[in-house]
Amino acid sequence: MKRTYQPNKKRRVKKHGFLNRMSTSDGREVIRRRRQKGRHSLTVSDQ
């Protein structure tokens, strides 16, 4: 049986990257909450 997590850099950034987050109001809300919490990295593309 194949495992559920099959790492792929392109897919990771396309789905969870900064531009994708900023493209929706809910995504911007995620960024806002993470900034407020003081997260070192806001999205997966901040490495």
Curated annotation (Swiss-Prot):
Instruction: Give the record's GO biological process terms.
Output: translation
Sequence segments annotated as region (Disordered): 20-47
List where Basic residues composition bias occurs.
31-40
| Xref: Pfam families | Ribosomal_L34
Which molecular-function annotations from GO does this UniProt entry contain? structural constituent of ribosome
Question: What InterPro entries does the entry give?
Answer: Ribosomal_bL34, Ribosomal_bL34_CS
Keywords (alphabetical) are: Ribonucleoprotein, Ribosomal protein
What's a GO cellular component annotated to this UniProt protein?
ribosome
**Lineage top rank: taxon:** Bacteria
Please give the family membership noted in the entry.
Answer: Belongs to the bacterial ribosomal protein bL34 family.
Name listed for the protein in its UniProt record: Large ribosomal subunit protein bL34
- Gene, per the UniProt record: rpmH
